[in-house]
Amino acid sequence: MEKMVAVGADHAGFPLKEDLKAYLKDQGYEVLDLGTDSHESVDYPDFAGRVAAAVASGKVPWGMLVCGTGIGMAITANKVPGVRAACCADPFSARMARAHNDANVLTMGGRVVGAGLAREILKAWLESRFEGGRHAQRTAKIQALEERVGGRTKGKRSAPGGPGPARGKGRDR
């Protein structure tokens, strides 16, 4: 099971997911593809939830998600207790996500990184290991916070267009 990765994407991440799925198989990984299976417009939380649930349940040890930026996938996956998703756009961040944060889900942006760089990021993440030590103390604090407030909080939403820079006449939306 150590060499098994659940993958998922929305329509914006579909082409990169397919490339990375082939890369994983070439590297000897078993791949659990949880969708999407086309360029048709879909909602990223549906696929992030599937992959995050597979990781959190122990069905697979690792997950990889791709959307336009990787951000929405990371936000969604991190709502699932036990998931530590990191959005990475370079190999160094991917290594540190595993070494220091024990990230078990990697997210990337199909509109941010090309296939070659995405393979380097994925390789760096898969080959890294959690260092433990002082980092274990920190991840334990994350887990304690998750247990204390997980599922009971209601995040506030910003109104469309705000907060943020002033918007008005002559400004792009």
Show the residue positions of the predicted features.
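A short beta-strand-loop structural module common to alpha/beta enzyme folds
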Residues: 30-41
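Helix-adjacent hinge/juxtasegments
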Residues: 47-87
